[in-house]
């Protein structure tokens, strides 16, 4: 298929009803629709009827219920992330910035384990900060070392220059008097 084209996959109505109810489904009449754009693809569930009124998806969002049968979409997405193998999860967490590790530590046990491994392996060596330490202080934009506003900048002290000794191309132990006589006469 060419880029930007859509492909919709649907089932016949009688097969759809049999599969939803007979295979232990909820009988919601959901069908699989697949959109292709560019190099990625999206999978979307769309209702084919008015059965959504009694569905768990239209229940009002309130307090979290501890029931495993009613899970929200956000929990389902986090569960998919937690179901990944630990090494892949560690690689994902290595892409997170250093300041966000504390928030990831409190998400779940599996993400906490992956965060600990990523912190020991990846973040122990590369811990860059978004802003420079000297430009951003605790209480706003401060100057380093409490410098007053004299419009004087602190210059870095010059490092002492190393003495460089040039090795002579002429060997001093040799007698080169014959060469100099031939050149200057």
Swiss-Prot record:
Organism: Arabidopsis thaliana
Domain called F-box: residue spans: 78-126
Protein name listed in UniProt: F-box protein At1g61340
Coiled coil: none
GO biological process, one term: response to wounding
PROSITE patterns the record matches: FBOX
Annotated disulfide bonds: none
